[in-house]
Amino acid sequence: ETGKLIMPGGVDPHVHLDLPMFGTVSSDDHYTGHKAAAFGGTTTVMDFVVLEDKGFQYSVDIWMKMAEKAAIDYSFHMNLTKFDERIAKEIPSLMQMGIQTLKVFTAYNGRLRIDDGSIFRAMQIARDNGMLGMAHCENGDVIETLIPEALAAGHTTPEYHALTRPGWGAVEATMRLAAMAEQANAPVYIVHMNMAGEVDMLKYARERGVTVMG
């Protein structure tokens, strides 16, 4: 007996590699990020496909090409950052591309966020096609009010990134997504939860029989 444990490789369901965002690109690509994950004992990662105007297949092809330098196992979620009738009809095709999850945002107005009605419809479509909805939960409208106020006051140091994104907004949005999930009878996964209040919202929703995870 060696006193050591044999453990399976970890699965990280939320990474951002080769990601263009706000005029820059994330520090790791699909090789360096995978290498770092492997050193930490993670052998599978799940990244997010950025939805381009040309549709799902075009977008997935871009990210599959970038992942050709992969060092470990990987898969993708789809960022649903646009929504219209064409996109609604195409969502089921993602299953044939190996993507079974849709991520929506309640923040980043005018960039990543879609409106609540579109989120609700996407949840219904996901439900009907055996897919899982995921949500980045914050209050985008409040954030978009606080950021200009902070900039006008000269508050540009790092702590104001947090101060312009109040934690209660994440709590409120988590409850909102749980309510939509109950109404749609669809499962939802709340990503990167930070607030105790979000856990409270999940507990409340689960007690009501909602399939909500975080």
Residue spans for each PLM region:
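Metal-associated gating/positioning segment near the N- to mid-region
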Residues: 4-69, 86
